[in-house]
Amino acid sequence: MDIEKIVTEVISAVRYDKKMTLSLARELSRRMTEEGEKNGNKLVIAIVDEKARPVLTEVMDGAFLVSHPVATRKAYTSVAIKMSTAKLAEEVGKGGSLEGLDTADGLIFLGGGAPLVVNGNVIGGIG
């Protein structure tokens, strides 16, 4: 699932206020759920605002219990570091530009989290 592509498409299609809104979060969640169902994935979708405060969390039927805290941490991490968690996972490894950051509390280094960027500004994150 290409989370960054979905984020870009939704942000382009939805009217936004340069800030995270519940309607934007709902549309992102709807698209992620649609994609998850199409691929047979049972997702937890966590969306936060620019300060990593929860805006929306949805749990698909049959999602793993561990998916809830993981999705929340992915959304938080993507806002805190302002990059996708997949890219971050590459950068924290030996010789990466963020080597050693993997000891920071609260961050997660698994793909599936992405910042929500509008006109160069991070307005939130999704995990």
Tell where the protein language model's regions lie, with residue ranges.
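Flexible, solvent-exposed loop/hinge segments and secondary-structure transition points
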Residues: 2-127
